[in-house]
């Protein structure tokens, strides 16, 4: 029975994200193959317009 706290140390092995070729941010997921910031590696680019302009989250809470 070794679930829980002792197993959490196993999660920090290796890199999950590397630098994205398109936007340059450290958001490109190696396993999934796309960038979490700009969407590089997918068919469409991720657009985050209004929330970035206003500087706060937009939508239902």
Curated annotation (Swiss-Prot):
Pfam families: Ribosomal_L37e. Zn(2+) binds at residues 20, 23, 35, 38. One of its GO terms (biological process) is translation. It comes from the Archaea. Its cofactor is Zn(2+). A zinc finger (C4-type) spans 20-38. PROSITE patterns: RIBOSOMAL_L37E. Keywords: Metal-binding, Ribonucleoprotein, Ribosomal protein, RNA-binding, rRNA-binding, Zinc, Zinc-finger. One of its GO terms (molecular function) is rRNA binding. Binds 1 zinc ion per subunit. SUPFAM superfamilies: Zn-binding ribosomal proteins (SSF57829). Binds to the 23S rRNA. Belongs to the eukaryotic ribosomal protein eL37 family. This is Large ribosomal subunit protein eL37. The gene is rpl37e.
């Amino acid at each position: 029975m070794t679930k829980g706290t002792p197993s959490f140390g196993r999660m920090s092995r290796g890199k999950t994200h590397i630098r994205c070729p398109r936007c340059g941010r450290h958001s490109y997921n190696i396993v999934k193959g796309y960038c979490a910031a700009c969407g590089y590696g997918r068919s469409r680019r991720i657009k985050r317009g209004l929330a970035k302009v206003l500087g706060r989250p937009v939508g239902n809470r």
